[in-house]
Amino acid sequence: MKNLIYITSVIFGFLYAQNELFIPETMSGNEFNLSLQNGTTQLFDGDATETMGANGGNLGPTLIFEQGEFVNINVTNNIGEETTIHWHGMHISPENDGGPHSVIMPGETWNPNFTVMDKACTMWYHPHLHEKTNEHVTKGITGFIIIRDDEEAALDLPRTYGVDDFPLNLQTKQFDATNQIVIGEHGDNVPMVNSTIDAFVEFPAQVVRLRVLNGSSMRVFNLGFSNNSTFYQIGSDGGLFLDPISMDRLLLAPAERAELLVDLSDMTGESIELKSYGSTLPQSAYGIAGLSTMQGVAPSGYNSNELNGNDFILLDINVGAQTDNPILTIPSLLVDVTPIDESEATLTRNLQITAPNMMQNSITGPFVFDGQSFDMNVINQTVQLGDTEIWEIFNMSMVAHPFHIHDVQFYILDRNGVIPPENERGRKDVVLVKNMETVRFIAKFEDHADDEVPYMYHCHMLQHEDEGLMGQFIVEGESVGIDNNITLPNDFVLFPAYPNPFNPTTTIRFKLVTSQQNASLRIYDISGRLVETLLNEKLIAGEHEIKWNGGNNPSGVYFISFETGEFFSNQKIILMK
């Protein structure tokens, strides 16, 4: 029987009482004032916990936006240090987006304003200051954004906030002996919902809508109910589906959102639990029983964390009486969804997630895109306004990464060439890329362009993001050509191997700018085992060419690892016999 972990507090043999689920207040209209501030919160009996919040000492209000409305927001920084606020998932201009360049100094007010262009969905806001995102989010500066539109309003759905429509921010955190939040370690063994430990809530005996956010820094949840009842996902990150999708488990990575309908109409007086089934998480997801492999050891504290590999309770649900005018049925249809056809793409971009070099720990990180750690002064990609692009994300590390891109909602095309499950076919801004997996998605970059202010793309495991697994792109308003990596390493260029796929020989070309530069070229297999060293010597400047004959190796995926000086690049090749 799979393990079930009950997270409780015990003193002198008595259990602390459960805590009623905190439901954030709402703000609506056209003018919004947010004060970011420090505070303390009584999360445990004993020492109060130092926290941060918006318009309070912990968490922030739920902002309700109407599609087509112009909103003006004043964000005042009262936490005593620099921060930012990012409107996660929203299609807005880069100067309003709230990325790491939009720093709010202590005591100052930032004033973003924009027209809400997104469809009805559940989004959220959080800090995005480079190297401080994890701390500021984990300490509590997060809040929901609910966007409404006419299409959603015409549907027979629950939408009375806090009555039959509930926001659920799921997190796990680590605390020290004095009940203070620990940042950047891996002992996150305390589940929380809306910053409530051992949370309980009463839902009415009818159809209830859950707006679920994985607000954790690192952990992937595998959600389901203790009675294994069917629930219905009606929307993902960027909007509603064509029709509800029935399921009994939902994988939710950090920063992903899901709108769920749960039919409790026959359960008056009963109780169930919302749980994470960590015992059945997919391989490489943060939260499995162990991450140690030949490529490295698990992060410190990970293997002793009792949540990892186990099932645990997030929320106790008591089913009470129906409300007036309850919703009692699950709708059969929702809204029109028109995915972007692959034929509309004019460009495919390829990004690889790796450790900085092949010999580093591919479990703990740090991790990088295309061999380069995040640099605020480097624009990694340039996109043309109006273009439709395919982005291909290949994860060469041994841990799954939730990839997030600002500005756009995308449609997942495939995972390792396989069409994604139904609930991943809607509008998305986060996708979990498992180890040794390639995910392709398609997006159209429209409406907003700025030659100077960039958008971000990054891993949404906040520790990885802070450590450098992030890049930035600008959207240009004029079609002047694609400039991939405006600031390139000036030591080398690694050209695409040709042919690829190949049998049995492929040609690898590279360029060195300076002479007497030591260059190494190695081939690894998919498990990270060194297959062959093709080059490890000093070379003169210019273009060089090396052929690799894989005839003595089995068919499969291999990786070219090229290093010179402090720079590193790699490339996937496929031997097909």
Question: Where are the language model's segments positioned?
Answer:
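C-terminal outer-membrane/trafficking sorting elements
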Residues: 5-7, 11, 484-498, 502-577
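Histidine-centered copper-binding motifs that mark active-site loops
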Residues: 18-254, 260-261, 280-282, 291-355, ...
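Aromatic/hydrophobic beta-strand junction motif of beta-rich domains
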Residues: 73-75, 212, 393, 506-512, ...
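Beta-strand signatures of extracellular beta-sandwich domains
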Residues: 84-86, 222-224, 402-404, 520-524
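Active-site pocket scaffolds in enzymes
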Residues: 87-89, 95-100, 104, 233-245, ...
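Short glycine/proline/serine/threonine-rich loop/turn segments at secondary-structure transition edges
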Residues: 120-124, 267-274, 447-456, 554-556
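Extracellular recognition modules
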Residues: 126, 275, 458-460, 559-563
